[in-house]
Amino acid sequence: MTFRNCVAVDLGASSGRVMLARYERECRSLTLREIHRFNNGLHSQNGYVTWNVDSLESAIRLGLNKVCEEGIRIDSIGIDTWGVDFVLLDQQGQRVGLPVAYRDSRSNGLMAQAQQQLGKRDIYQRSGIQFLPFNTLYQLRALTEQQPELIPHIAHALLMPDYFSYRLTGKMNWEYTNATTTQLVNINSDDWDESLLAWSGANKAWFGRPTHPGNVIGHWICPQGNEIPVVAVASHDTASAVIASPLNGSRAAYLSSGTWSLMGFESQTPFTNDTALAANITNEGGAEGRYRVLKNIMGLWLLQRVLQERQINDLPALIAATQALPACRFIINPNDDRFINPEAMCSEIQAACRETAQPIPESDAELAQLRGEDFSQLHIVGGGCQNTLLNQLCADACGIRVIAGPVEASTLGNIGIQLMTLDELNNVDDFRQVVSTTANLTTFTPNPDSEIAHYVAQLHSTRQTKELCA
């Protein structure tokens, strides 16, 4: 039997994990084993909301060392993280300033300023990326305006996964799928857009040309002295999750469910027309030149904050209690900027419930309208797919079949690119066949008589009436 041992480092906004994958070539079987899991979270430092990158690096090294201590030969390593955030380095590779998190308020108001000065349509047609107030474009503008004293010391700007790969290998890389989340990459050239960089105040010399997934960045030398390749995987965690989504057919959509939830479909071409702009659709880079056409949804962030504030540890019990309650009594818009990082999430939700205006949730409809074809099934992947209540609500609200799983989608997609780089698999579609036969998948059938299905139908009926009367 021929085996490959690949290690995936998967960092999320609330936790990180080092996972060992064992791939058996002859039977095309893939098994995962968790080596090390650790917490991640926001910290307050010198008036900024930051990440503790030193702690994360220590946890990564601890996990890698554990694998080596077991005497396992590692064939490759890959790292994926969340998007938009970055670390600045000087000429000697030492950090400049703080690793500020996207939930910090430093970039507030700068998105509107960019739209006014550059033109909203022009920014969108250049980047194809949705407008979010914490995109790297605005974070860099905040940095260069508010901390100009740092600029003479900056030689490099590395996005989070590239920074940790650099710490392991000493080699710098700017991976394409994650680079596109910055709103700084030109959608036509796949290189940094000079006009957008100029507005941000950043120097183009801080960045190298983005590279597509599948190249070896460098090597990590393990304690035993072996040189292990570190692969540039699809380093944006959602890009990795989409690779592991067992999409079947052109009418399949995906929902990567975690702290953030991202709903969309794959396309060979981007969508940057006025309809896409009006719906704030994003065209993030994917593997093999594909685009991840999607919408950002606030996801489980609100739930995570409520659990923390109320000190609730038994999530299954809470879900069971919630399932017994009537649906749609209180509706809020979780994508409202007020929920990005409020001081007290519970109080903010209560305040929103007191307001009367209710938004119409229609991410699936906007995506379907963009394609000109309805979806027939929705693949929910990531940690959030373990929430059976949420899965059923999605099926009922969208009116289509939901297939939940795999849970560790980002990890699996990370491993998939490594196996392709090692010439064990041909392409993404080949890897998805492996996922389909090895992952635990659960199907949820929509219930048209559910309360939420009736509520969504009523909302759409109300909207159509308003459009007729306008």
UniProtKB/Swiss-Prot annotation:
What does the record give as EC number?
2.7.1.5
A Gene Ontology molecular function term for this protein is: ATP binding
Look up and give the organism this protein is from: Shigella boydii serotype 4 (strain Sb227)
Q: Which cofactor does it need?
A: Mg(2+)
Residues annotated as binding substrate are 83, 236-238, 296
Q: Which residues form the active site?
A: 237 (proton acceptor)
Q: In which pathway does it act?
A: Carbohydrate degradation; L-rhamnose degradation; glycerone phosphate from L-rhamnose: step 2/3
An individual GO BP term? rhamnose catabolic process
A Pfam family the protein falls into: FGGY_C
Q: Where does ATP bind?
A: 13-17, 259, 304, 383
| Protein name per Swiss-Prot or TrEMBL | Rhamnulokinase
CDD domains from the UniProt entry: ASKHA_NBD_FGGY_RhaB-like
The broad enzyme category this protein falls into is: transferase
The Swiss-Prot or TrEMBL record describes its family as follows:
Belongs to the rhamnulokinase family.
- Cite a GO CC annotation: cytosol
> Which reaction(s) are listed as its catalytic activity?
L-rhamnulose + ATP = L-rhamnulose 1-phosphate + ADP + H(+)
The free-text function statement in the UniProt record for this protein reads: Involved in the catabolism of L-rhamnose (6-deoxy-L-mannose). Catalyzes the transfer of the gamma-phosphate group from ATP to the 1-hydroxyl group of L-rhamnulose to yield L-rhamnulose 1-phosphate.
Name the UniProt key words of this record, in alphabetical order: ATP-binding, Disulfide bond, Kinase, Magnesium, Nucleotide-binding, Rhamnose metabolism, Transferase
Q: Which cysteines are joined by disulfide bonds?
A: 68-222, 394-398
